[in-house]
Regions:
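Short beta-strand elements of extracellular/lumenal beta-sandwich folds
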Residues: 1-27, 174-177
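Low-complexity, intrinsically disordered segments enriched in Ser/Thr together with acidic residues
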Residues: 3-9, 74-148, 174
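Beta-strand-rich extracellular modules
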Residues: 11-13, 119, 155-159
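A surface/secretory-pathway sequence property marking extracellular, secreted
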Residues: 26-97
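Enriched for extracellular/lumenal, surface-exposed ectodomains of secreted and cell-surface proteins
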Residues: 29, 135-139, 151-163
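Long, low-complexity ectodomains and other extracytoplasmic segments of secretory-pathway proteins
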Residues: 34-35, 170-177
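Short Trp-Ser/Thr-centered turn/loop motifs at beta-strand boundaries
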Residues: 64, 161, 165-169
């Protein structure tokens, strides 16, 4: 498959310091939902991690291979007993969370950034391969190209702002002519 990176970025535009930042992301899968578990993200193929995530200084990454993350919200899963600090097969990871270590804060007027090493599949499953055929008739009339899309957004929260917030959505596309 094709290798690429997601860049997760949180900018604190205020002068307020935020502690206990937790960033939570489920990797795109066909039929996945947003971080609240309430709305389809409409991913049409699966994305996998290709290696360990290198967090910014002062943060620790935890991984899970649990499929439950696709049925439940960040609020339900972020503290569940499913997380480990390493895995033997990064392609099996379904979600990760990045947690601020004790004493680490997102300072005022600063940015948190981390690159997520991802990979599109070498071969699409049957359900994903059926989707371009469904789209073809729509695209033939408009003259546009057909593609499959994997959509990603991440959730985050802090001690000072404990309500889960969701990032903007980004996508990876596989075009078909």
């Amino acid at each position: 498959g094709t290798n690429f990176d997601y860049l997760l970025k949180i900018t604190n535009e205020t002068k307020t310091e935020y502690s206990d930042l937790v960033v939570y992301d489920t990797l795109p899968r066909s039929g996945d939902k947003n971080v609240f578990g309430t709305q389809d993200r409409s991913s049409e193929f699966d994305i996998h991690l290709r290696r360990v995530i290198t967090p910014p200084e002062g943060y620790t990454v935890f991984y899970t291979t649990s499929a439950e993350v696709y049925q439940k919200s960040m609020a339900d899963m972020v503290n569940a007993d499913i997380w480990m600090d390493s895995v033997s097969d990064y392609s099996a990871v379904t979600a990760f969370k990045i947690v601020a270590n004790e004493g680490t804060a997102l300072n005022g007027e600063s940015t948190f950034e981390v690159r997520i090493p991802a990979q599109a599949p070498n071969q699409l499953d049957d359900a994903s391969m059926a989707k371009p055929h469904e789209k073809t008739s729509q695209d033939q009339t408009s003259g546009t190209a057909t593609w499959l899309e994997a959509n990603n957004s991440f959730g985050f929260q802090t001690n000072e702002s404990p309500t889960v917030m969701e990032s903007n959505t980004v996508w990876a596309r596989i075009p078909f002519a």
